[in-house]
């Protein structure tokens, strides 16, 4: 009932070379387990640390296998993924866990709970073994998530030092600390309820990466910032990807006065079903109506609109109103929904009154649309590197020189409240 392969021993490379990323694959399907393992072994910078059938196997082997990343199935015999997750995090400091699940509502809800308990990310898994074998997008996305989430962990072999200075990605610690605000209670190893507060092991996970992030941030040149628009903002646009659900929950919880003044439109890279659940979580966090955008519905202040999975969401002018326009066209920036279509469309509706926030995420989605918003007289705020899970999207905006502010996640909401009140310029 255990492993399909032996646990691989840690490798020692010549000093100065990077160790391969050690990935543990945990799935009760031998076919899927073998397929993902072959994909990992085909990557020059990765290796399979262990290939296991159940969550119980993973918990018992995690210290010996010493993985950097665990790809963890949700539905397994003996001990499922959500039950194994806190035990894995308690046993292995700095462990990155990517939850893998099929696109069912139940699994989407479990994935969100896993994020609140310390999982780094999730990935939707194709429904059948045949679909997995043919799923180039699934393979690409999984390898990218493993690589980008683990980037800050990589270091020269045999050197017990912080991540190298050339690591451009943000600390996963924000994922853990944002869980404190999620109001989802955790349980200890004995199953007893405890306060919603980070496990001591998770606090330790927070401390070291934060210091490395702070050192890198201090050594980096300060970004070139633009002045905020002289226009009073009339709409808030938000784009996010990896790490976005937790960041969005934190952000919307603090911008009630903004939502009351204007519409809030969000694109989060996420598949169908998951966006439905995310909208429900956002409504609870904000205490305001939030739902997936519906084609041709009128956009109103006091509401949060989320791009539905598998559709681009744009806005358009229709008489005196702004309306949602859903687009089933090709992926943009390899994503659907993508941030750029939303940002670009906002110019025709709000011109210089559009204010956009680019949160944590891989890639550069939002940068082109943000550039057009700035050219039209609007403003961009980017999440800073230290508080981002992955500083791809916000980093691209910063490097493009289009941002009026680059802020830690916890400082973005207060800044937005001041800006929309007219006193934050």
UniProtKB/Swiss-Prot annotation:
Keywords: Chemotaxis, Cytoplasm, Hydrolase, Phosphoprotein. It is found in: Cytoplasm. One of its GO terms (cellular component) is cytoplasm. Signal peptide: none annotated. Residues 221-417 form the CheB-type methylesterase domain. GO terms for biological process: chemotaxis. Phosphorylated by CheA. Phosphorylation of the N-terminal regulatory domain activates the methylesterase activity. Its EC number is 3.1.1.61, 3.5.1.44. The keyword RNA-binding does not apply. It catalyses: [protein]-L-glutamate 5-O-methyl ester + H2O = L-glutamyl-[protein] + methanol + H(+); L-glutaminyl-[protein] + H2O = L-glutamyl-[protein] + NH4(+). Residues 22-140 form the Response regulatory domain. The active site is at 241, 269, 365. The modification 4-aspartylphosphate is found at residue 73. One of its GO terms (molecular function) is protein-glutamate methylesterase activity. Its main location: cytoplasm. Residues 150-174, 203-223 are annotated as: Disordered. It comes from the Bacteria. Involved in chemotaxis. Part of a chemotaxis signal transduction system that modulates chemotaxis in response to various stimuli. Catalyzes the demethylation of specific methylglutamate residues introduced into the chemoreceptors (methyl-accepting chemotaxis proteins or MCP) by CheR. Also mediates the irreversible deamidation of specific glutamine residues to glutamic acid. Belongs to the CheB family. Contains a C-terminal catalytic domain, and an N-terminal region which modulates catalytic activity. This is Protein-glutamate methylesterase/protein-glutamine glutaminase.
